[in-house]
Amino acid sequence: MKLCIFGGNGFVGSAIARKAVARGWSVVSVSRSGRPFATPAGHSPAWVSEVEWRKGSPFDLSTYDALLPSCDALVTTLGTLLETPYKEQGVARPLSVLKALAENATGSRGNPLAKDGRERSYERLNRDSALQLFEAFHSSRSSTAATSPSPFVFISAEDIFRPFVPARYIQTKRDAETQIWQRAAADAPAPTVRPVFVRPSLMYHPHLNPPSTLPATLLEATSNLHALIPRALHLFPSPPPSTIPNAAVPPAAASLAALFAIPPIHVDAVGEAVCASIADEQTQGVVDVARMREMLGFDALGWGLAPGRGRKAGVV
């Protein structure tokens, strides 16, 4: 298995790369800088030397077109939670996030028509980059000898951040899912690409992103309490689970309710779930937190695994 990861040196992408290397897969990372992953302290883990690090952009086909025919699967982790800068070394920092949220709330984001504003827009980073990569990967399948549909994994998100984050964030994610699904379905009855939409909730890691642990612990507690409430008493019942994406976005109140109902997830668990989805030819469509926990063997009722406790399904 040869896996291409766009954004493999970021918070999520590095977790996927590490899990893929552990499986013995060949991994190539394509990112804007082309730099290998490094911890916040500047350390380079041993697995980093097993990955090929390349510089490229989803909007510049010449930077990766020759690579795709040799890849069995592609994962894109590209996207942005906010249209103003909020990451340091690829990891969201609390103060930077709060500053960006304030700028979004007050509308002081600068000129949206400026070059940097256009390049950081939700439409470009969350939707168009994924569509561009899907089309390129789909076109490359004619040059392969694959006997089954090749996995294309889009790292999407659970709808848990509204009204704190603009609705366009999740809308562009859902638009990308829907358009990719429809494009892949158009190849029936002989599809060449198997789309998978992984939807993590709040992702945390005690060491790579220590500030994420406190909110994760709190949300773990609220999700456990929510699980004890009879479904009939939920103010905003969760929609029936479906693997087919839907571009419709529910009211913001439903998103806020989901924030307290859906447990956070360790970024390494997301990495493992992505690799499991690639390896399982039956997995396609939406893979939400509940489905990830199911495939990784987490307990279904209490959601289990509070941040920083225990090791399960390769989570450390």
Say what each PLM segment does:
Residues 36-132, 136:
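NAD(P)H-binding glycine-rich loop region in Rossmannoid oxidoreductase-like domains
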Residues 136-149:
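A short helix-coil junction within the Rossmann-fold of NAD(P)-dependent oxidoreductases
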Residues 1-25:
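N-terminal Rossmann NAD(P)H-binding glycine-rich loop of SDR-like oxidoreductase domains
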Residues 1, 40-46, 90-115, 143-145, ...:
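Eukaryotic N-terminal low-complexity, Ser/Thr- and Lys/Arg-rich leader segments
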Residues 4, 28, 196:
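Conserved beta-strand positions in the Rossmann-like core of class I SAM-dependent methyltransferases
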Residues 2, 72-73, 151:
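Structural motif
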